[in-house]
């Protein structure tokens, strides 16, 4: 067993056919969301670093008239006795047995000494005074102070009183016991293993359609919606559940036997014949891996069909071993070949129909789109900030052989969830977050090249720059390491029970404390949730019930955007007053009606407004009485989606007007490399750049090889 070192991901949600967990990132953010890459850094803070000491008040009754008992006792005598007490090895040993390590001991001792030596000794507990007097006279040993010290330490650090209970509550080593419904079923597990474009999901979905009742769990809202539409088109009634939306094949009084959902929204109480869990390798994801682990262990189905990379096979078997479930693996080969080109593109004049330039920031999207336009090529554009409707519209334009947009510029948002007829995937860079792309991510992106049954059946992967091609070949040639451990998160009930023992702790403090004491087995890690904690800090001073605060803090909100964060705080504050969050109140903050985008900044503003409306719909799913105008907000959201589509259609004119508007190229919800699109704060962080050249690397479109060449040239000039 080991102590968890991440920041927990805990989510709450819906009842009935919806999951009891929320879905903060299922529908809009791709798995490789680099905005959150910073979250993958494991937290190392211990409970001793987190807890704050409480001031212990002196007794209200005084020790007046005790002169005959304490004699000439004064603060000097007391200091001598306490110093001797502190140095005793036995005292330290007893403290450790009661959960007081050296750090807590010194903090507790400092408070204890201050308590024992006030200006007026009459305010000290009489029993303690008598003992201190006896110790100073030599008739009692200083170690007899320990019971008083321990009692004081527990008042200074209340968690010490409940430490054993807190460890029991935060024990996450046996998550399979959390799902009694699933444990009551004799489940058959099928693993459909293969690369992109191998037909693994197709075969699993065939079984989904054949079953009398079934649930599909996808990684993205777009994919869940696609399964929803296709299933209904086949004449099989199917409902849809995502974090922001519920749709019924008939109506809410007649739920269908088939359900398509984002993976976070799976209800572990829903009994079905077949459950399909797509992209099972997402178990490894730092942010969302907990949802796949929960689905794997908690889906109450006779048959579980897993689809994903072979790298997940071993860990899936290990996770199911304690409950006696075995896995039948079915391997699939890629239906069309994927080749690595011998040459890089190098020039935009070499771009051809069916090409997709993959970037890792909005800045690079804008840069490459403008270069293509200068070469007479009108591209389709897809990046993470775009609403689903706009993404689908851009994908449709690119896929349409009669449309002039036969080239695509996209972030790695294309890695999953969109059907695209791509011939060549062109990597604009091989780095993301200033680090080389991991093999599994590069293969996921490269695998989008070539699509069985289309004009581009044979796929090709290459790079924009000649110097990156060797790097790409090396990355893609590496074997994907088997997944060693998977994400896990505690339940809301665990957090709530934890809070009962620490009633004075803020929600932020509860999160930190839970992580510092919880335990997980070697097959698991606690999913990080930097954004959840940031949201908790934003509304820390707003009075909200724990469940409400908890749900607000699991919202799928971009915490790096000050405007959306400010609206989030206003929503929480109005909620706390008991006032309904109405449509009129909401649009009043958004300067409604919106104006068509004529610059990149204005397009970015429309995207922010869309995210705010999306946030409203997400909260409305959980608090329909307090956010009653979901239908009107959804209509407004559709209107914004259309306006954003129009803005993207006139993308090139926006670029010409706003090419210098660097703010519009801010953080995107898709994976954005810091090298391609660093924020101002990142550029200014101390100790993060060792030279001006490395600063240029972060600000401009310069590769690592370019940087090395610059160094060599400067060295020659010096000589």
Curated annotation (Swiss-Prot):
Its EC number is 3.6.4.13. Transmembrane segments: none annotated. GO terms for molecular function: ATP binding; ATP hydrolysis activity; DNA binding; DNA helicase activity; RNA helicase activity. It is an enzyme of class 3 (hydrolase). It catalyses: ATP + H2O = ADP + phosphate + H(+). The keyword Transit peptide applies. GO terms for biological process: mitochondrial RNA 3'-end processing. Residues 671-687 have a biased composition (Basic and acidic residues). Keywords: ATP-binding, Coiled coil, Helicase, Hydrolase, Mitochondrion, Nucleotide-binding, Nucleus, Transit peptide. Residues 343-499 form the Helicase C-terminal domain. Residues 1-18 form a transit peptide. Its main location: mitochondrion. It comes from the Eukaryota. Residues 693-717 form a coiled coil. Residues 16-42, 662-692 are annotated as: Disordered. One of its GO terms (cellular component) is mitochondrial matrix. Pfam families: DEXQc_Suv3 (PF22527), Helicase_C (PF00271), SUV3_C (PF12513), Suv3_C_1 (PF18147), Suv3_N (PF18114). It is found in: Mitochondrion matrix; Nucleus. Belongs to the helicase family. This is ATP-dependent RNA helicase SUV3 homolog, mitochondrial.
């Amino acid at each position: 067993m080991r102590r968890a070192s991440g920041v927990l991901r805990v989510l709450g949600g819906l009842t009935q056919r919806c999951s009891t967990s929320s879905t903060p990132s299922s529908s809009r953010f791709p798995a490789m969301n680099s905005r959150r890459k910073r979250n993958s850094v494991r937290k190392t803070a211990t409970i001793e670093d987190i807890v704050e000491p409480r001031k212990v008040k002196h007794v209200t009754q005084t020790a007046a008239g005790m002169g005959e008992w304490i004699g000439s006792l004064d603060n000097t005598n007391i200091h001598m006795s306490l110093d001797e007490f502190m140095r005793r090895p036995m005292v330290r040993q007893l403290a450790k047995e009661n959960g007081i390590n050296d750090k807590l001991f010194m903090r507790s001792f400092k408070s204890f000494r201050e308590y024992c030596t006030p200006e007026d000794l009459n305010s000290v507990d009489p029993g303690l005074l008598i003992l201190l007097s006896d110790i100073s006279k030599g008739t009692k040993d200083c170690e007899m102070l320990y019971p008083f010290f321990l009692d004081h330490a527990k008042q200074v650090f209340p968690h010490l009183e409940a430490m054993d209970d807190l460890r029991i509550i935060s024990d996450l080593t046996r998550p399979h016991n959390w799902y009694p419904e699933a444990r009551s079923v004799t489940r058959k597990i099928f693993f459909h293993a293969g690369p992109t474009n191998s037909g693994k999901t197709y075969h699993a979905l065939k079984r989904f359609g054949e079953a009398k009742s079934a649930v599909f769990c996808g990684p993205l809202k777009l994919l869940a919606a696609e399964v929803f539409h296709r299933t209904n088109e086949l004449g099989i009634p199917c409902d849809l559940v995502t974090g922001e939306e519920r749709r019924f094949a008939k109506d809410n009084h007649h739920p269908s036997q088939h359900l398509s959902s984002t993976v976070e929204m799976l209800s572990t109480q829903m009994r079905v014949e077949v459950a399909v869990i797509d992209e099972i390798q997402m178990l490894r994801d730092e942010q969302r891996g907990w949802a796949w682990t929960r689905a794997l262990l908690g889906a109450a189905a006779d048959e579980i069909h897993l689809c994903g990379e072979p790298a997940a096979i071993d860990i899936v078997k290990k996770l199911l071993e304690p409950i006696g479930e075995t896995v039948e693996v079915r391997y699939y080969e890629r239906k069309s070949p994927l080749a690595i080109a011998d040459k890089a593109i190098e020039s935009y004049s070499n771009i051809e129909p069916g090409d997709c330039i993959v970037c890792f920031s909005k800045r690079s999207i804008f840069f490459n789109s403008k270069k293509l336009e200068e070469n007479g090529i009108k591209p389709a554009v897809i990046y993470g900030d775009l609403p689903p409707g706009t993404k689908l519209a851009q994908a449709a334009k690119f896929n349409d052989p009669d449309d002039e947009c036969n080239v695509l510029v996209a972030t790695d948002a294309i890695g999953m969830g969109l059907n695209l007829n791509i011939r060549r995937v062109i990597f604009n860079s091989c780095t993301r977050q200033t680090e080389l792309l991991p093999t599994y991510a590069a293969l996921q992106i490269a695998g989008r090249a070539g699509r069985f049954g289309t004009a581009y059946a044979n796929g090709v992967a290459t790079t924009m720059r000649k110097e990156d091609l060797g790097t790409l070949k090396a990355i893609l040639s590496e074997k994907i390491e088997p997944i060693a451990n998977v994400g896990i998160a505690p339940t809301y009930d665990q957090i709530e029970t934890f809070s009962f023992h620490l009633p004075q702790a803020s929600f932020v403090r509860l999160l930190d404390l839970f992580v510092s004491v919880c335990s997980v087995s070697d097959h698991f890690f606690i999913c990080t949730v930097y954004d959840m904690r940031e949201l908790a800090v934003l509304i820390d001073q707003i009075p909200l019930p724990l469940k409400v605060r908890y749900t607000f803090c699991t919202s799928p909100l971009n915490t790096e955007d000050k405007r959306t964060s400010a609206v989030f705080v206003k929503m929480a504050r109005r909620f706390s007053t008991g006032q309904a969050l109405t449509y009129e109140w909401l649009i009043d903050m958004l300067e409604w009606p919106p104006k068509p985008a004529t610059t990149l900044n204005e397009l970015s503003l429309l995207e922010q407004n869309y995210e705010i409306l999306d946030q409203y719909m997400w909260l409305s799913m959980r608090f329909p009485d307090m956010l009653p105008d979901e239908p009107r907000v959804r209509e407004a959201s559709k209107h914004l989606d259309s306006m954003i589509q129009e803005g993207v259609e006139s993308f090139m004119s926006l670029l010409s007007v706003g090419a210098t508007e660097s703010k519009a190229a801010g953080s995107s919800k898709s994976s954005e490399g810091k090298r391609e699109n660093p924020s101002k704060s990142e550029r200014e962080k101390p100790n993060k750049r060792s030279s001006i050249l490395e600063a240029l690397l972060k600000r401009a479109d310069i590769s690592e090889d370019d940087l090395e060449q610059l160094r060599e040239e400067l060295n020659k000039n010096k000589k």
